[in-house]
Amino acid sequence: MDSDNVDESVGMLDLKTKFDVFIENGDKNLEMDTGTRATTVPNTPTSDTKNSNSHSSVSPLRSFSRRSGTGSSVGSTAGKTNLSPQLLTPVRLNEGEHPLKDIPSANGSNVKSKSNNKSKRRSLIQPITAPISPDHHGNNFSSAGPVASETRKLSGHQRVISNTSMHSRRSSSQSIMNDVSQDGSLGISSLLQSLASKELELLETKQRIEDLRRQLASEENAYNQGALELKSLKEQVSSYLNPTTFGSNNNNHSIQIADGQDYVIDSTTNELIPTISRAESETKLNIPKSSNSISSGNSKIHSRALSNLSPKQEEGQEDEANESIWSKSLSMFTRLDQIIQQEVEKSLNWESSPEPTASTFAPITEEPGQYYDQNSNSFVRESSRQQNSHNSSEANDNSYSSRSIWNFVSEVKTGLLGKPDDELKGSKPQINTKTDSLEFSNASDDANDSPTIEYNIKQFKTRRKVTGDVEVENSSSKLRDVSIGDNVEEDDNENRIRQVNNRRKVVEMIDFN
């Protein structure tokens, strides 16, 4: 049956081509259309097929050079192999085998396998390849082979749509710019699309920047809270490490720590001391308000040093010792500087100005209340005399400041010698005008019990105010004698009394200046 069918097919080669014969035979036997399938036809049957089907004849292999060309039949010989240049349909060797079955040939090394052969037919559904990154956009299309060449024939608008559907806005905008640079100018639609993608990209960047700013602000707030918590923990740890400093008031100090109270660790005693205001420190240490706050920290140190040098005394005496010269502030040194400056300026002014003489002002008898100045040859009225008396009061104040400097010097000396203040309590400094020395007299004790303490400290060369009647009379002798007539009357007596009073005033004025 098979040989008859083969013979009939060979006879019909003149009327039809061999290709059409194979297709028709395959369609009739399998009842299916094999026009779209791509297979290879083995040129020679296998050895197994020869052994099993030795009685059956093998269908010959035919090759066609052209569509219209005539074909030549080739016998079924095992040594000859021919490859078909065109797509062929497999031949069914026997009734039990399927025509699409993969039958290996005897010379398998010379014949290509089914996986190596590719179909020359192209499907209408072509795959669209997308680049992995924007940088390799052009390389992926160039490596796509014939598919890339076919896609380049499409319009630019379709290519832009296919690319933007697979990529993000940034990659799509870059791909559009690459296409514009490669293919030249695109349409208005592609330009508008690139514009929109660029705007969206900028909006996303701006939103990302705002998110980073909000995140930065939240991180800063978290850092500040952490710093406050760390500070409170440090203060709590320091309070627990030094329980003797706080004593029974540990809870109160912990509350103050939570409220934000600041503490200072003393380097000498390693104690945690809470900071207090200036008013509280002045009230606790009994320091006047005019004093400087620097002395409040140094008072304890000096008091401890003095207590170590001196023998131990009772508690009442220690409290009195704390009120020594060292408990006072540094304003005392400032006061000393001011007093010395005043004394120096005053001494310089005295050295530069000439001393007034007794003949500068001479009383006259022409008009009461007037004086004659010999230097300026003019009259001086009562107003100028009052001004001179005001200057004399200022000189009195300066003399008082000269006494205050010696008071300060004596206090400093007693502090340096380490003598307690109770020895000098109630004592008032007095200036001995005869010896020019400074003396202290105790007013609380009797004169017999406590002797007078005398310090041979020389006084500055300052002019002293003379108020004694004896010195006034001696200085009045320097004035001119006024001739008084022999005839003494009541008017002359009144003038004489007025002249004596005026002389005393002039002498006092000269001494003050």
UniProtKB/Swiss-Prot annotation:
Residues 190-240 form a coiled coil. Residues 62-76, 161-180 have a biased composition (Low complexity). The keyword Cytoplasm applies. Residues 36-60, 78-87, 349-362, 372-400, 429-450 have a biased composition (Polar residues). Pfam families: TDA11 (PF17084). One of its GO terms (cellular component) is cytoplasm. Keywords: Coiled coil, Cytoplasm. Residues 26-180, 347-400, 417-450 are annotated as: Disordered. It is found in: Cytoplasm. Transmembrane segments: none annotated. Belongs to the TDA11 family. This is Topoisomerase I damage affected protein 11. It comes from Vanderwaltozyma polyspora (strain ATCC 22028 / DSM 70294 / BCRC 21397 / CBS 2163 / NBRC 10782 / NRRL Y-8283 / UCD 57-17) (Kluyveromyces polysporus).
